[in-house]
Amino acid sequence: MTSASTEPFFNRSLADTDPEIFGAIGKELGRQRHEIELIASENIVSRAVLEAQGSIMTNKYAEGYPGKRYYGGCQYVDIAEELAIERAKKLFGVNFANVQPNSGSQMNQAVFLALLQPGDTFMGLDLNSGGHLTHGSPVNMSGKWFNVVSYGVREGDNLLDMEAVQRKAEETKPKLIIAGGTAYSRIWDWKRFREIADSVGAYLMVDMAHIAGLVAGGQHPSPFPHCHVATTTTHKSLRGPRGGMILTNDEDLAKKFNSAVFPGLQGGPLMHVIAAKAVALGEALQPEFQDYAAQIVKNAKALSETLISGGVDVVSGGTDNHLMLVDLRKKNATGKRAEAALGRAYVTCNKNGIPFDPEKPFVTSGVRLGTPAGTTRGFKEAEFREIGNLIIEVLDGLKVANSDEGNAAVEAAVREKVIKLTDRFPMYGYMG
């Protein structure tokens, strides 16, 4: 094979090599540019993060950890991983960080592998109260391999029932208690959770995947020094690539987590993603990230207040973080219908169960809304109040139509307003 024969492989563009995938990416770029992203677990990464993740680091196998690899030629990917580790430690004020987990589920599985045996008891927030699949859902590995004791929110105010957490912990003596969730809009009392964990001899694990950016930005109390271990994804409010991290101050636990990630669960880490994690963590260490985190919360409060003023119920009466659960029953809508109608109006969100939801999981009585992606675009309170009013327009139109097809006229009118709004806040201009 000559250099002439390999030249196309190394230099042919995606558009020329695979026009179908190129076309799909182009359409997705258009969707992201023109639609308002309100999915609470999504965000928009910087060009620098994209460049790192799309780099030649993807070519390198690097089983093991920096300085202790099972492959040669790792001296430069070691630099990337060491930077990611040091930046994570600095950002969250901890002594140990593992940046290799490929996802949020795998980071949580690694903690289970390190601290639990099959059949052990652990406690986690019930999925219907805002927990995550990996916190003990019966359809998830966590619910199949372990004895799960779920806690939840109180009926009425929809706030965490800490007395019930204490009582269940005393009754069941769990080995691990998980605090944190995916759809709880209030401040977590880490200190109280640690007191409960200590009272029954349990480890306290905090899954701060959703709020890590707020913790880093000073908008939510840090789980340290209260927790034994914290896990977080690197996307969501941290605004990095999709992946996970495990953080702790305990050296013995850190060794267990490292062994659980590799070789316990994973083989070669995704070095291009780890490089991108390092970039995102570096961005989060800049002073402007504090402003970004503060704006996320301001925007969430503005959106929540606008919806409530428009006759829409928000679970627990508001939000202290980046997200809110909207109870649609007063609008005679389901989450499934509302998600579809808002999507047709170029407002993207996800249907979501609400506490004590009478509807099926694929229907739901609510939608979950979040502000991180819109805040990244530059939206402030005024824009989120406008967005709140647009959501109300769609929901009111849906109520009048009372059908899965929605209200085409209202949705078309809102769609035009959304395009005008998003055109004022362009993204990725260099992509053409």
UniProtKB/Swiss-Prot annotation:
Q: According to the lineage, what is the superkingdom?
A: Bacteria
Give its localization: Cytoplasm
Q: Which GO terms describe its molecular function?
A: glycine hydroxymethyltransferase activity; pyridoxal phosphate binding
Q: Which SUPFAM superfamilies match?
A: PLP-dependent transferases
What catalytic activity does the UniProt entry give for this protein? (6R)-5,10-methylene-5,6,7,8-tetrahydrofolate + glycine + H2O = (6S)-5,6,7,8-tetrahydrofolate + L-serine
Q: Where is this protein chiefly located?
A: cytoplasm
Q: In which pathway does it act?
A: One-carbon metabolism; tetrahydrofolate interconversion; Amino-acid biosynthesis; glycine biosynthesis; glycine from L-serine: step 1/1
HAMAP family noted in UniProt: SHMT (MF_00051)
Modified positions (N6-(pyridoxal phosphate)lysine) are K236
Taxonomic lineage from the root: Bacteria, Pseudomonadati, Pseudomonadota, Alphaproteobacteria, Hyphomicrobiales
Residues under site feature: Plays an important role in substrate specificity: H235
Cofactor(s) annotated in UniProt: pyridoxal 5'-phosphate
The UniProt entry, under InterPro entries, shows: PyrdxlP-dep_Trfase, PyrdxlP-dep_Trfase_major, PyrdxlP-dep_Trfase_small, Ser_HO-MeTrfase, Ser_HO-MeTrfase-like, Ser_HO-MeTrfase_PLP_BS, SHMT-like_dom
- The protein in question is named Serine hydroxymethyltransferase
Q: What is its EC number?
A: 2.1.2.1
- What is a single Pfam family found in this protein's UniProt entry? SHMT
Q: Where does (6S)-5,6,7,8-tetrahydrofolate bind?
A: L127, G131, H132, L133
Complexes and interactors: Homodimer.
By sequence similarity, the record places it as follows:
Belongs to the SHMT family.
> So what does this one do?
Catalyzes the reversible interconversion of serine and glycine with tetrahydrofolate (THF) serving as the one-carbon carrier. This reaction serves as the major source of one-carbon groups required for the biosynthesis of purines, thymidylate, methionine, and other important biomolecules. Also exhibits THF-independent aldolase activity toward beta-hydroxyamino acids, producing glycine and aldehydes, via a retro-aldol mechanism.
What does the UniProt keyword field contain? Amino-acid biosynthesis, Cytoplasm, One-carbon metabolism, Pyridoxal phosphate, Transferase
GO biological process terms, alphabetically, are: glycine biosynthetic process from serine; tetrahydrofolate interconversion
User: Which GO CC terms are listed, alphabetically?
Assistant: cytosol
